[in-house]
Amino acid sequence: MPKLLDKLNLDHKHLSRLLDLMEKQLDGFHEGNEPDFELMCEMLEYVENYADQVHHPTEDLIFHRLLERSDERRDVMETLFEQHQTLSRLSKQFRQSLEGVVHEAVLRRDLVEQQGRELLKLQRQHLDLEEGSIFPLARELLTDDDWERIQEEAPTSIDPVFGEQDQARFRTLYQHLMGTWDE
């Protein structure tokens, strides 16, 4: 399997871990508890700054290359392109709502929770669609030259949470992950 696809699969594993963590925070929020808003905001900042700026653009390059090779699953790739945009928008909206709560803005709890649940649901569907449909197709159809070209064009950045940690920027998230690493 191409190294780039290995990296994307690892990113998905890490993101799934964050989605589970976000879901636990939302479950507590639903029960009337105060979630760790700083933790939730850091998770969303990570998604905005790594997934939206590095991970998704890399996947988009793979999708474009696949479309040059074949029309097979074009509809799925078009859905994934749209989902990248929608996920970015939902993430930003949810983060703004959480920051509003932190700054004591008057927001309905149920609507804030609904934003979070919608983001989680779409993100999980998105990961399943990529891993179940498009990544196997990429393994099958893309050549070594395709992978080299994608690698050259892909944005480069070290994962600030699961790679070379930016402990100052993502302190709360990093500390939480280190405390729950074996879960």
Where are these regions (language model features)?
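Small-residue-biased structural context
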Residues: 1-183
